[in-house]
């Protein structure tokens, strides 16, 4: 640009040429912060991503299902508005998935960048439940008020999910979960993405007082189907019939759940048949004679290839065959079994059925690995034996076992004692990041260093 300069009398004139150059690199996605956290439907969709910049750039997607289709060239050194074309593939998986696109200046050193986050649904419809509500379940604002209403609105294998807000729900009878419908709890009642939950919150399902059967059933799923139950507390069962406080068969995955304060004549901590448990806490349950039903089995009955990852089984009481875990043909990784009382004999923390192979890898257990009538696990790699005293140097080192706080103290031997290849989740039961140290911790809770 040319600027003309003169004296006050305008007798002298000269011209000044001003050349403007970019002093500071600039690059940003031209969307609000809320719109930079994008929700995409299960079927996939195309996205136009507007970007303002004054530098050459690179555009990189974090996941293979996010496709960068077109990146217009940057021309010149003035601010330029471009439109980057993005395509999201259909989600054929079991759960919501998350990824991102980073736009940054070209080169190895990043001076300026911006990110578009993408969450993609795994279903076509969500049914909402919130304690005290009275709607039709189509949104949080119009949520159903009871779990029974929410389940009635779902259909088996119907490309649906059931989202239940935090709070306490008193069940009316035994409850069958819908097959192929992921059921999530712990929402505050405003989220539109699964990742936005505060995992310290849970939805509590209280068994009906008159129900003498397991309070929750998950029946066998179709071959190849997996179904998640995540973010719940199951409590209040008083069982004299059936398998245990909760009962699940083939294909179900229980994650970030607590099973506590239940009484049953068998399997008060749950009965699981070809099921996966991840980041679960099972505590303060009692297997004992209940009315005319005589005590049998254990606290947790894991059969037919059930797998446990980072499960904490503590402070339960049994008059059955063992006080902690009864398992066959399964696998137990990064789990702790401690403080479980056997009322009728030796304090058996676990039991292996005859002639069944079971993997025990990087677990911590009190009083010996298993009572098994002469059988042995096919592997006990990395397992440690715990003292019966929580406060001992070789005790579990829970924060306050007496009051039910099973998070870890900084001196706990469970810290960094797990097996990293067995990690099944990037988060623990209350949303803390895994892995925090060099290795994953044993149990449902990851120890986090306080800054």
Indicate residue ranges for each PLM-predicted region.
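Acidic Gly/Asp/Thr-rich repetitive segments characteristic of extracellular carbohydrate-active
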Residues: 131-165, 441
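Predominantly extracellular beta-rich ligand-binding scaffolds that present long acidic/polar faces
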Residues: 172-182, 191-200, 210, 229-231, ...
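A short beta-strand micro-motif common to beta-rich folds, especially ectodomain repeats
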Residues: 1-9, 84, 95-107
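Short, T/G/N/S-enriched strand-turn elements that build extracellular solenoid repeat scaffolds
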Residues: 147-156, 170-178, 218-220, 352-354
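C-terminal accessory segments
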Residues: 224, 382-448
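Surface-exposed binding patches on compact interaction domains or structured appendages
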Residues: 50-85
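C-terminal edge beta-strand
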Residues: 12-22, 112-124
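Solvent-exposed, low-complexity, repeat-rich "mucin-like" stalks and linkers
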Residues: 23-61
